[in-house]
């Protein structure tokens, strides 16, 4: 397919013309190209307008710094925390690593960054937090540009611009695209792979590149294969040289990629293990992810998908009726992904994030055809998405990150590293851990591993704590010698544990806003309590 496209040249039709005609046409062609070059924007980076590329990169960097809230624990505990342990030899590995459900390939990216910073003597805690996120922001910017380039090939610049605009103003993309989540990496790799996928009209087809990006996405997160099932089957069905495609593209790329993943995991686990198979077995075949919550089958259709799309939803529906038939495969991919994830009990918004760029294609088609209402539609999208993006990025659930900045001040500066200790009495994995403190401070949090033995009445440590917080604390810390110097908790527990705080000589040292939408165990504010000890100066706070 690529060779045919490369060998085709429209000018070859005129090879048998006279020399005079050839000179005349060539002279006109040079004049035409010169005029076009004067009118066309400068091209360079990624084959696109340099200013457009720089604008996108700058926007995603700004995006990175304007997202100062937490979303889900995995953005720290399955990436930065693991990388911190790999490089600095201290950090916490969750139960998924004991069960070998996660692979080291993705954390190795951040571990490499940490190692370089360490060798340069620049491994400050702020660099450890922000540089990995800046890296993800740059990758997301490249994915945005590739989506724009693809639509310009498939349709025209006008449609491409509207798709690009829809992508940039999506509140959920803004909220997620700079986080160190496997879902974010999966989404970026999926968008990049789509650029090289053999869609009708695409001029950037490369089976090796797109299959390599898909394989990498599956190594990072095995469920990344789900959106690609219909796309891979379509490619295989339409390919005339099926055996060549399989033997010379798919199999070599898959073998090399997963062999590299296998070797990396062998080095760090100390034994041969195929984590992708373990991950699929646990989350898909055994459906044990329901330990962390289950939802009805229609949740993605009734809540998940509408929330992720937000106010883009009516334009997505409109665009589905307008898009050409050759792009129906993208709609089929979205529907297939929603169907497969709907069959699993445990559901989260982020699971369907990888198909959001696909949806933006149809939203862009809608806006491109709204001639009369286009300005009103654009104003509606901006006014509804920008405030929501800023609110979720700067306000909602920010306390769990702010409190870690305070805990950094607790890190011992003297020769006695055991002089301070922190107990985080919150729903497990509410906050980041050593990756956001970067000192060997004694810390503890409430554990919540799932039961893999089949017990019917299983309660983890966090469950037992919340049954009766005061009694649990009194039993756990029966002697004053074992009391931690600092306690971190949501404000909803303050009345229940007040007796314990008084008897332990704790006073509130700091308070941080967390959310306007408290629920159950999660409060609106986070309190830090410090134990008053003779001769000790409290760290204080705000």
From Swiss-Prot:
**Per the record, a Pfam family?**
Glyco_transf_22
> Where are the stretches annotated Disordered?
1-36
Q: In which pathway does it act?
A: Glycolipid biosynthesis; glycosylphosphatidylinositol-anchor biosynthesis
Q: Looking at the record's lineage, which domain of life comes first? A: Eukaryota
Chain ranges passing through the membrane:
52-72, 125-145, 213-233, 244-264, 304-324, 327-347, 351-371, 376-396
- Topology within the bilayer: Multi-pass membrane protein
The GO terms describing molecular function are: alpha-1,2-mannosyltransferase activity
Chief location of this protein? Answer: endoplasmic reticulum
Task: Give the EC number.
Answer: 2.4.1.-
Sorted alphabetically, the keyword list is: Endoplasmic reticulum, Glycoprotein, Glycosyltransferase, GPI-anchor biosynthesis, Membrane, Transferase, Transmembrane, Transmembrane helix
Instruction: Give the InterPro entries listed for this entry.
Output: GPI_mannosylTrfase
| Subcellular location per the Swiss-Prot or TrEMBL entry | Endoplasmic reticulum membrane
Glycosylation site positions: 480
Question: Can you cite a GO biological process for this protein?
Answer: GPI anchor metabolic process
Query: According to its UniProt entry, what is the function of this protein?
Result: Alpha-1,2-mannosyltransferase that catalyzes the transfer of the third mannose, via an alpha-1,2 bond, from a dolichol-phosphate-mannose (Dol-P-Man) to an alpha-D-Man-(1->6)-2-PEtn-alpha-D-Man-(1->4)-alpha-D-GlcN-(1->6)-(1-radyl,2-acyl-sn-glycero-3-phospho)-2-acyl-inositol intermediate to generate an alpha-D-Man-(1->2)-alpha-D-Man-(1->6)-2-PEtn-alpha-D-Man-(1->4)-alpha-D-GlcN-(1->6)-(1-radyl,2-acyl-sn-glycero-3-phospho)-2-acyl-inositol (also termed H6) and participates in the nineth step of the glycosylphosphatidylinositol-anchor biosynthesis.
Q: What protein name applies here? A: GPI alpha-1,2-mannosyltransferase 3
